[in-house]
Amino acid sequence: MPKKFQGENTKSAAARARRAEAKAAADAKKQKELEDAYWKDDDKHVMRKEQRKEEKEKRRLDQLERKKETQRLLEEEDSKLKGGKAPRVATSSKVTRAQIEDTLRRDHQLREAPDTAEKAKSHLEVPLEENVNRRVLEEGSVEARTIEDAIAVLSVAEEAADRHPERRMRAAFTAFEEAQLPRLKQENPNMRLSQLKQLLKKEWLRSPDNPMNQRAVPFNAPK
């Protein structure tokens, strides 16, 4: 009998080799895809980080530019109020509506401000009030011989004075202004004279020194 062939089948070996090669190629491809995905994801994180950094820097520069523009407007406005010429600075022509309205309002206030050279009248220019006590005595209505009579004379004099508080209004307001205006100037150094006088007027309306705030006797009250 002829001997059996003991060697390896060439076709089977070739098939196994092809399968092993295909498997190795598939594994290599899969590994490459995994690596590419990893590096791609890492690149995304880097790009996002750089983008956030750029946006933060841009916001910082914008904020700094706004601060510079605000400072320039304040300096220009101060120069106008002091009567000097505003510095010419080459800037953007964009001006907000609020800035325009604020400038117009300030110019209007400067035009409407009263002449600061006007001085309040002194006590020498105000006519002297009549001595009511002397007039009452001279008319002979009451003669103070005792303490009771003196009290009665003073009461009559106070009533006569309170019948017309407006007669003392001008002199009282002048005295009030001379006494309180320096205090208001010291407490409000940035206010103009017109604003100080408005504030003084409000205090005058509530002041006990105002004759109109004192007890006024009706004009037709019985004597």
From Swiss-Prot:
Give residue numbers for the modification (Phosphoserine): S141, S194
Compositional bias segments (type: Basic and acidic residues): 18-74, 99-126
State the residue spans of region: Disordered: 1-126, 204-223
Q: Name one Pfam family in it.
A: Ccdc124
Location within or outside the cell: Cytoplasm, Cytoskeleton, Microtubule organizing center, Centrosome; Midbody
Is-annotated flag, keyword Transmembrane helix?
no
Gene Ontology MF annotations:
RNA binding; transcription coactivator activity
| Distribution of this protein across tissues and organs | Ubiquitously expressed.
Q: Which GO terms describe its biological process?
A: cell division; transcription by RNA polymerase II
Coiled-coil annotation reads 15-82
The alphabetical list of record keywords is: Cell cycle, Cell division, Coiled coil, Cytoplasm, Cytoskeleton, Phosphoprotein
Any single GO CC term annotated in Swiss-Prot or TrEMBL for this entry: centrosome
Similarity field: Belongs to the CCDC124 family.
Q: How does it assemble?
A: Associates with translationally inactive ribosomes in the nonrotated state. Interacts with RASGEF1B.
Q: What is its biological role?
A: Ribosome-binding protein involved in ribosome hibernation: associates with translationally inactive ribosomes and stabilizes the nonrotated conformation of the 80S ribosome, thereby promoting ribosome preservation and storage. Also required for proper progression of late cytokinetic stages.
Please give the name of this protein.
Coiled-coil domain-containing protein 124
Native organism is: Homo sapiens
